[in-house]
Amino acid sequence: MGMHYRQLGNTGLMASEIGMGCEGFGEDNYAMAKTLIDMAKEHGVNYIDLYASDPKLRAAVGEALCGCREKFIIQSHICSVWKDGQYKRSRDLLEVKAGFEDMLRLLQTDYIDVGMIHYCDAVSDWEEILNGGILQYALELKEQGRIRHIGLSSHNPEVALAAVRSGQIEVLMFSVNPCYDLQPADEDVEQLWNAEKYKNPLVNMDPLRQELYETCQRMGVGITVMKAFGGGDLLKEELSPAGKALTVYQCLHYALTRPAVASVMAGVHSAEQLSQCISYEDASEEEKDYAPAFAEFPKISWEGHCMYCSHCAPCPKKIDVASVTKFLNLAVSQDCVLETVREHYEVLEHHAGECIQCGTCESRCPFGVSIMENMRRAAEIFGK
């Protein structure tokens, strides 16, 4: 079947669903960078995230991209600098500027497709970025054509929402997986995996995270995903906070079915791991299906919350229930229905007003969603 591509928000870029993080590029004395980039090119993976500031890693990537730079969308991080022989997240403008120039030199390119303002998890930090010169510098780089689009990476939905609503970013790099999505906003990313937070049963997605995804969808801000596998813990029953292992395909599919998500950055360490992620594109719907696993999570309940898994299908009237529900959620989260949401709803082949209230969808839903009521509401809101 081959790689699928998605629009990255309103940037005009078409991103491969499977992207690649740089975690494994340093393996085998940095030779892994060329191995993975060559493999990515062969299989249509065109999106690479480079958060690391290690000059040897950046140089290895620059060498690997020689002759094929234009085949890739490079998402590289402003404010990730190398100082005194180690990585540093910096908001010092002199350090940031020097780090950016060094990045371009080592990557052997004169522009970055997505200049990602690096790792902002505190509201006070976002305010510093806004008022301390970092955002202004990013805007200057964009005006010069040295970065084509401005992004922000964050693990905190409160900060991410503020950045998205500011209208200043076009791409959000955000941590997305079914366990993180249960947790409220926190300025300490380590709290997302704190075992204490999972001791008591958890119910449904954190409302702020849901609002973030829907706001990105409405405003045309594309999401690139990090932490889809929770650092690998979600793939192992003994390490997963959910108490049950998920597969690579299930983790990828969960992230790719969130609103506004364009590409998942797989932090692979070997050709075998990258191959497994790429093979998602040819996996069956049964292999991708995360709903049965979620329904069996001993510590987590998604009762009443639509996961867009399409287990409700087939509909006798051929309504795409998952899409209708997604547009309904986008509509009711605002005081009025935005034209972009209405337009997306209009082009659906069948609409909620065609629902005959037979209830077969609800009998199939593993999460007890009130689908018939959702169809009634959607028909009322959208007028058909």
Show which residues each predicted segment covers.
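Acidic-and-aromatic substrate-binding clefts and catalytic sites of carbohydrate-active enzymes
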Residues: 26-31, 49-59, 81-83, 123, ...
